[in-house]
Amino acid sequence: MGAAVTLNRIKIAPGIADIRDKYMELGFNYPEYNRAVKFAEESYTYYYETSPGEIKPKFCLIDGMSIDHCSSFIVPEFAKQYVLIHGEPCSSFKFRPGSLIYYQNEVTPEYIKDLKHATDYIASGQRCHFIKKDYLLGDSDSVAKCCSKTNTKHCPKIFNNNYKTEHCDDFMTGFCRNDPGNPNCLEWLRAKRKPAMSTYSDICSKHMDARYCSEFIRIIRPDYFTFGDTALYVFCNDHKGNRNCWCANYPKSNSGDKYLGPRVCWLHECTDESRDRKWLYYNQDVQRTRCKYVGCTINVNSLALKNSQAELTSNCTRTTSAVGDVHPGEPVVKDKIKLPTWLGAAITLVVISVIFYFISIYSRPKIKTNDINVRRR
């Protein structure tokens, strides 16, 4: 019988590429059993991601060890942004707890499990694994950078999601009061968050003639029209002399409305100059889409009266324009001009050429010829 396989030598050798990597050289009485087991002992403090959205220190957390060992490898700034999850299974030397044995070549989990007395020296565990999470920013400067999109590189998703959640509402309320025409403020408004609509309602109640208020009215109608109506009412109540307000706040007289219909259909300030819908209340805006008004100009060079009667004829009915406005909130789409295609032009050219060819043939004068008598013998 042959002698039993015995371990004669253990030697720890450093790695070359990474100082955390080491080799445990196992020498047996039979050289064919010699092995070099690669493992790692973590010594870094991480201030960067090992891969997008995650940090994986080279540390195997075995039973009985506190999870604080894992968190000790990341800087405090990252500790707020990442959470520890169940990592992949790993193996560690008990006499060097936390070491991470690499599975490679012949060294596999099955190989370690089959080794006699392996559990006396090798323990199983889970590798430390952190993933990035959404987190609340603690300082106002970071909130300002993320919500104003000055620098979004390290912003959590809840502060960088195109204003879909409430996390930027407080900052944007103050920011947009100072710069309501800012593109980011208009993007916040387009998300139709109620704090945004309320903020712009208050702003436009003082500055309805500003350009961004036209966008404000377009966005809120028809679902949230009360924000716009409130702003228009307050502005026109404070600026009664503003001609733009004459349609919304017309002097209280029912005679015109009684005989001519709703004033949005015939009043000059409603039908001609006030084309911007922000100067109309929403119900007026809807009413104007139903108006059947036609505008025209009549020029009279001479007028003859006979028996106190006069007849005038105008061209109003010849207009081809659409009657009334489009419904509020629906964009006006202009029909594209249809240009002739090259194929159609080529076919037309060929047909014309053929026609001219036959015309030229049949228009030529006849050639005079002599009759030839032929007699068969």
UniProtKB/Swiss-Prot annotation:
Tell me the GO BP annotations in alphabetical order: DNA-templated transcription termination; membrane fusion involved in viral entry into host cell; symbiont entry into host cell
Where does this protein reside within or beyond the cell? Virion membrane
**Looking at the record's lineage, which domain of life comes first?**
Viruses
* InterPro entries for the chain: Pox_virus_G9/A16 (IPR004251)
Keywords, in A-Z order: ATP-binding, Disulfide bond, DNA-binding, Fusion of virus membrane with host membrane, Helicase, Hydrolase, Late protein, Lipoprotein, Membrane, Myristate, Nucleotide-binding, Phosphoprotein, Signal-anchor, Transcription, Transcription regulation, Transcription termination, Transmembrane, Transmembrane helix, Viral envelope protein, Viral penetration into host cytoplasm, Virion, Virus entry into host cell
The cellular component terms of Gene Ontology attached to this UniProt record, alphabetical and capped at eight, are: membrane; viral envelope; virion membrane
> Which residues are listed under lipidation as N-myristoyl glycine?
2
List where the protein spans the membrane: 343-363
Q: Where are the Intravirion topological domains?
A: 364-377
**Induction conditions:** Expressed in the late phase of the viral replicative cycle.
Membrane topology for this entry? Single-pass type II membrane protein
The residue spans the entry assigns to the Virion surface side of the membrane are as follows 2-342
Please give the Gene Ontology molecular function terms for this protein: ATP binding; DNA binding; helicase activity; hydrolase activity
Consult the record and explain the modifications the protein receives after translation.
Answer: Most cysteines are linked by disulfide bonds. They are created by the viral disulfide bond formation pathway, a poxvirus-specific redox pathway that operates on the cytoplasmic side of the MV membranes.
Kindly state the subunit structure of this protein. Part of a stable entry-fusion complex (EFC) which is at least composed of proteins OPG143, OPG147, OPG155, OPG086, OPG094, OPG107, OPG104, and OPG099. Formation of the viral membrane is necessary for the assembly of the complex. Interacts with OPG094. Interacts with OPG153.
Question: In UniProt terms, what function does this protein have?
Answer: Envelope protein part of the entry-fusion complex responsible for the virus membrane fusion with host cell membrane during virus entry. Also plays a role in cell-cell fusion (syncytium formation).
Indicate the family of this protein: Belongs to the orthopoxvirus OPG143 family.
Query: What is this protein's record name?
Result: Virion membrane protein OPG143
Q: Which organism is it from?
A: Vaccinia virus (strain Western Reserve) (VACV)
